[in-house]
């Protein structure tokens, strides 16, 4: 069973937090980190994040041509945006549903379908993420950037589906509960022989460090 290449793209504080305890929607990284994200998603066919992340941000990051920190041009070519979860509480007024992108939904609850939402395609979660991702590959999706949140990252980790990690370490101690890999069932993740090699790294101007990891041994079996 073949799946797309899964690339986790995140910014994390030194203490492993994805967002601030109070203002979850605020980006914890700098403008330099935004350029890292911009470059990462320009190289994939699709991005995926969970319904909880969409509820917090109500939009997705679009590929841009940056002129400076405040001026940019949104590029015409954008990856497909895939949302995973229950769409029942989504609001069609959110910016996301008016952004110039193709929107796909992986519905975790087929009984709860909001037909008013502007999704181009709808899929259903099938038994495991491996099987669900295999269905996406059949649709021509070869590379997916996994953008969060923690629950979805955890689900992918539990099935050992992540092939690469692009992480920016932000020089801040934030605290709070929003860690990028939940403690729940963490010991099962450590049972995997997860060894990673550094493909590249870069110290950014803002004392942030970007590291690109890839699996040392691809344990994913195709059958």
Task: List each language-model region with its residue ranges.
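Enzymes that bind and transform nitrogen-containing heteroaromatic metabolites
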Residues: 1-223
């Amino acid at each position: 069973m073949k799946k797309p290449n899964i690339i986790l793209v995140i910014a994390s504080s030194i203490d492993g937090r994805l967002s601030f305890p109070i203002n979850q929607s605020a980006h914890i990284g700098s403008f330099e980190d935004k350029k890292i994200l911009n470059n990462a998603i320009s190289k994939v066919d699709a991005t995926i994040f969970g319904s909880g992340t969409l509820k917090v941000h109500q939009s997705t990051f679009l590929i841009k041509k940056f002129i400076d920190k405040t001026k940019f041009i949104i590029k015409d070519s954008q990856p497909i945006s895939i949302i995973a979860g229950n769409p029942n509480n989504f609001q069609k007024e959110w910016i996301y549903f008016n952004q110039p992108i193709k929107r796909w939904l992986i519905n975790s609850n087929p009984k709860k379908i909001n037909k008013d939402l502007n999704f181009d395609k709808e899929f259903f979660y099938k038994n495991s993420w491996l099987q669900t991702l295999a269905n996406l590959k059949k649709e021509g999706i070869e590379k997916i950037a996994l953008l969060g949140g923690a629950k979805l990252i955890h689900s992918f980790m539990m099935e050992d589906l992540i092939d690469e990690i692009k992480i920016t370490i932000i020089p801040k101690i934030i605290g709070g509960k929003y860690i990028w890999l939940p403690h729940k069932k963490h010991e099962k993740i450590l049972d995997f022989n997860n060894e990673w090699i550094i493909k590249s790294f870069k110290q950014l101007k803002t004392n942030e460090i970007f590291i690109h990891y890839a699996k040392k041994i691809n344990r994913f079996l195709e059958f």
